[in-house]
Amino acid sequence: MSILGDALTDARVLDLFAGSGALGLEALSRGAASASFVELNPPSLHALEQNIAALGVAEVVTVHRADAIRFAERLPPGAFDVVLADPPYTADHAARLVAHFRRNPFGRILSVEHRSDLELDGDSTRRYGDTAITFCHAP
């Protein structure tokens, strides 16, 4: 997360495939103004809601129970400043998300975590063992 640096300051953050909310909650701890979380799995949603309550950040978050790809496909350009995504590695979600961002940049920066052997059409990629993070920037 530190690689995003000042981009998180006062940012509107979207956490796709949020799970427990770790990425979006960390963004808030690093100065983001707000975070929206998108998660479909009920146990993950429960954990997310517990984490939001435990951290006392309910006033600056929104939780959407939705399919993350479909949610992203409905967003207008520039809807968020920073988009964080940690999709399941077993599906093509990362590639679909990057392709959609290239057509419709719904944020200034997209950060997608994925398998390190997967090549995505990003602006830069950092590899850490079996995991990689690809970054895309809006034009």
Regions inferred by a protein language model and the residue ranges of each:
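Class I S-adenosyl-L-methionine-dependent methyltransferase catalytic core
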Residues: 1-139
